[in-house]
Amino acid sequence: MGLVFNNSTIVAPQAKGIIDPNTSKLIGANDQFFQDMNAELSDKGFLVTSVDSLITWARTGSLMWMSFGLACCAVEMMQCSMPHYDNERFGYAPRASPRQSDVMVVAGTLTNKMAPALRKVYDQMPEPRYVISMGSCANGGGYYHYSYSVVRGCDRIVPVDIYVPGCPPTAEALLYGILLLQKKIRRTGSIER
C-alpha cells in the first residue's frame, strides 16, 4: 500500500474499501456519497471539504445512542448490539446518560404515565439530537392502540426522525434504520428544531 514513484511523480494507490461479507461488494458501493469520496480520494490523494461537512461526517460516524426500551422491541435492540450484527462498527455506541447521547431509540409501548419521563429524557439530550421510533407500539400504539392508557405513537411527545416498522422489528431493520439516520444526517447536516 503506500506511494508509487513513477518518473519522479508521486501517485497514490487506488483507494480500496471494505468488502461486505454478505454481499461481496464494497460497503457503500450503491451510495453516491461514498462513490464520490472514493473517486476524489483516488484522484487527488486527499479530500477538500468545509468545516460543516467535516462536522457532519464526524457526527454520522459517532452516534451515541441511549436506550428507551419499554417492551419486547428492546430485546431486538439488544440483539443489534451483539457480535453477530455489531452496530458499533458503524460508530453507533451505547451510552447510559442522556447528556452523553445523540440518538434515543424508543422501543415499545409508550403509556400516558411514561410520556413525561420520555420528554424529560429527550430534553436532557444535547443538540443535535435524533429519535428512532422502533416497532409498531412506538410508531402508533400497536396492539394497544385503542387502550385508554397508551400514547398512539411517540411522535406525539417527541419529534421522530426515523420510523422502524415491525412487531417486533428485526435487528436488521433497526440496523437499516441507523444507516438511514446516518444518510439523513449527511444529507441535511445539523437539524435545527
Curated annotation (Swiss-Prot):
Keyword entries, A-Z: 4Fe-4S, Cell inner membrane, Cell membrane, Iron, Iron-sulfur, Membrane, Metal-binding, NAD, Quinone, Translocase, Transport, Ubiquinone
SUPFAM superfamilies the record matches: HydA/Nqo6-like
Cofactor(s) this protein cannot do without: [4Fe-4S] cluster
Gene3D superfamilies tied to this protein: 3.40.50.12280
GO process terms (BP): aerobic respiration; electron transport coupled proton transport
Catalysed reaction, written as an equation: a quinone + NADH + 5 H(+)(in) = a quinol + NAD(+) + 4 H(+)(out)
Cofactor binding, note field: Binds 1 [4Fe-4S] cluster.
Residues annotated to bind [4Fe-4S] cluster: C72, C73, C137, C167
Main location: membrane
Gene Ontology MF terms in the entry: 4 iron, 4 sulfur cluster binding; iron ion binding; NADH dehydrogenase (ubiquinone) activity; NADH:ubiquinone reductase (non-electrogenic) activity; quinone binding
Membrane topology: Peripheral membrane protein
Its EC number(s): 7.1.1.-
A GO cellular component annotation in the UniProt record: plasma membrane
InterPro entries: NADH_UbQ_OxRdtase-like_20kDa (IPR006137), NADH_UQ_OxRdtase_20Kd_su (IPR006138)
Localization annotation: Cell inner membrane
A Pfam short name: Oxidored_q6
Group of enzyme by EC: translocase
Similarity remark: Belongs to the complex I 20 kDa subunit family.
HAMAP family: NDH1_NuoB
Job of this protein: NDH-1 shuttles electrons from NADH, via FMN and iron-sulfur (Fe-S) centers, to quinones in the respiratory chain. The immediate electron acceptor for the enzyme in this species is believed to be ubiquinone. Couples the redox reaction to proton translocation (for every two electrons transferred, four hydrogen ions are translocated across the cytoplasmic membrane), and thus conserves the redox energy in a proton gradient.
Quaternary structure (record): NDH-1 is composed of 14 different subunits. Subunits NuoB, C, D, E, F, and G constitute the peripheral sector of the complex.
This protein's name: NADH-quinone oxidoreductase subunit B
Species for this entry: Bartonella bacilliformis (strain ATCC 35685 / KC583 / Herrer 020/F12,63)
Lineage summary: Bacteria, Pseudomonadati, Pseudomonadota, Alphaproteobacteria, Hyphomicrobiales
